[in-house]
């Protein structure tokens, strides 16, 4: 899974985390370009679209075209372990895994930035919006900074020292078209003073992440543009932020487009304490939630062989 934005880093900062993951298997054979999703299982499989609307199918279609591969059929199996429509980069993770699995089956060198670019375009074709931050984190792993907003993707990994994370996901019914809705509420114009403040917050976020400056990081996690517009759509937003801070979190943010939230701490022990406070926040708010302590995860991994 991945968590994007991290406060003031809207659409340009994301981190891969080990709380949840997807798995994709592909089998390539001679054929005429058919891509068939033969199996979907896992704890969140019931919310996965079927047919051509499935992100895995679309990602493989685009990958075959990008690699100029013809005369093959592809059978796909998806194990869906990331909650759907929860702000955890689930569709992007599936797309990245599918493309990487195809590359492995074809014994082609793994170009992680190219994978991210194709996966982002697959998301755009299915959901209307690419999320290059999420897919880049899923492909490269770690915490990533986007240096471009469209393909070819330019990105850098940033080493994250002494940080642990708490991922909290309220158990609510997935909202169809949620990401599009959450983008519509974002302001389209800004006063110059707000733009400058937003830029300063992004500077603080990057400085804090790069150098481990907790004070700067705390400031950078407090967005002044996107989060204020979205917060009213996030269950228990204010109480989760408040309780997490009481537990010792550096700060808490909406993960992607929500409804999940991400709290950042300075150690695993501190994360466990914050997780306890976040669980209490949802209880006091009257909402069931799954709360997990997470570490930074590596990028997509490929295994070649097996039964496909």
Per-region residue spans from a language model:
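Acyltransferase
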Residues: 160-242, 246-247
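Short, well-ordered amphipathic alpha-helical segments that serve as non-catalytic structural scaffolds
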Residues: 54-64, 202, 240-243, 277-278
């Amino acid at each position: 899974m991945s968590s994007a934005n991290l406060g003031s880093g809207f659409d340009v900062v994301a981190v891969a985390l080990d709380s949840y993951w997807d798995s994709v298997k592909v089998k390539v054979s001679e054929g005429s370009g058919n891509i068939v999703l033969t199996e979907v299982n896992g704890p969140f499989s019931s919310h996965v679209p079927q047919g051509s609307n499935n992100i895995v199918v679309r990602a493989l279609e685009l990958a075959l075209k990008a690699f100029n591969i013809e005369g093959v059929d592809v059978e796909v199996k998806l194990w869906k372990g990331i909650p759907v429509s929860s702000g955890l980069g689930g569709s992007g993770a599936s797309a990245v895994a599918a493309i990487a699995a195809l590359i492995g089956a074809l014994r082609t060198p793994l170009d992680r930035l190219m994978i991210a670019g194709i996966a982002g375009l697959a998301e755009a074709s299915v959901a209307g919006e690419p999320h290059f931050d999420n897919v880049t984190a899923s492909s490269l792993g770690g915490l990533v900074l986007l240096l471009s907003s469209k393909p070819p993707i330019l990105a850098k990994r940033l080493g994250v020292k002494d940080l642990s994370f708490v991922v909290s996901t309220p158990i609510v019914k997935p909202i169809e078209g949620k990401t599009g809705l959450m983008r519509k509420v974002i302001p389209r114009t800004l006063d110059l003073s707000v733009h400058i403040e937003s830029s300063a917050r992004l500077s603080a976020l990057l400085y804090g992440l790069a150098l481990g400056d907790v004070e700067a990081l705390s400031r950078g996690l407090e967005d002044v543009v996107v989060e204020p517009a979205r917060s009213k759509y996030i269950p228990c937003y204010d109480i989760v932020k408040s309780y997490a801070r009481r537990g010792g979190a550096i700060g808490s943010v909406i993960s992607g487009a929500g409804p999940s939230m991400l709290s950042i701490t300075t150690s695993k022990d501190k994360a466990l304490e914050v997780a306890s406070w976040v669980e209490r926040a949802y209880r006091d708010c009257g909402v069931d939630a799954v709360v997990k302590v997470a570490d930074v995860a590596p990028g997509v991994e490929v295994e070649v062989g097996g039964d496909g």
